[in-house]
């Protein structure tokens, strides 16, 4: 390849999982790259058809409708993802939980703008949350709930799984240089772009209006030891260099509502039943996009207090959080 005339990029995209998936590919054969990219996006759409909470025909919708009354068989791929979600729930101390759906509904975020529930409603929803309510039978490849009202929502892991599937399809097609993202919140790098060591990915900082000088519940709509220093200016997340690695960013300000002078975000702590309020942004980088998707949510929920423990779950993990008090916490 002539370094002065690098391989042209081929881009493909689709809308799935309520967001836009895009793939940028580099290589010598543009037609082959485009075909590989389209096949990778087909993988994303196939997974959406299995996991969607809002499609009555999906495997997860069927589980939610029937599993409290009888075991429901699912495909091996979906069962494997549910087992992975259970492991991540345990590793995160419950900060990541795919049974969060009753709380999401309670707070009005399931297809709505959000609403303030009363304490009794929160308590009822919390009683339905927890992986102890989900019985997985590997011999039958089935799922069962022990309570009526338990629901699964794979929104915090499904996008990462879709990107992993797309990346695997690209590699099987011989692609060695590509960048995949789903709504920019989860990104996966394959190899590196021409004439570069890796893919540069910037993390957008939280809006300055969300920062607070003091702590207050619900008030606000990396090979080195962890650093945690308060700053007096808006923290600026670093630009990360990705090569055969995935990055996920979780933040709570995308969907929120105001009530009584407070702003409540859509990311909920399954352990308390309340919206996350002290951490504005969390990012995780690992080779597996399924894990970065889930663990970035767990990190946002766990906050600064749980950052060190979560960062120690994987040797190669890089993490970053930004708190409402303008504190940037990085583990590289």
Where are these regions (language model features)?
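Mature catalytic core of soluble alpha/beta enzymes
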Residues: 1-332
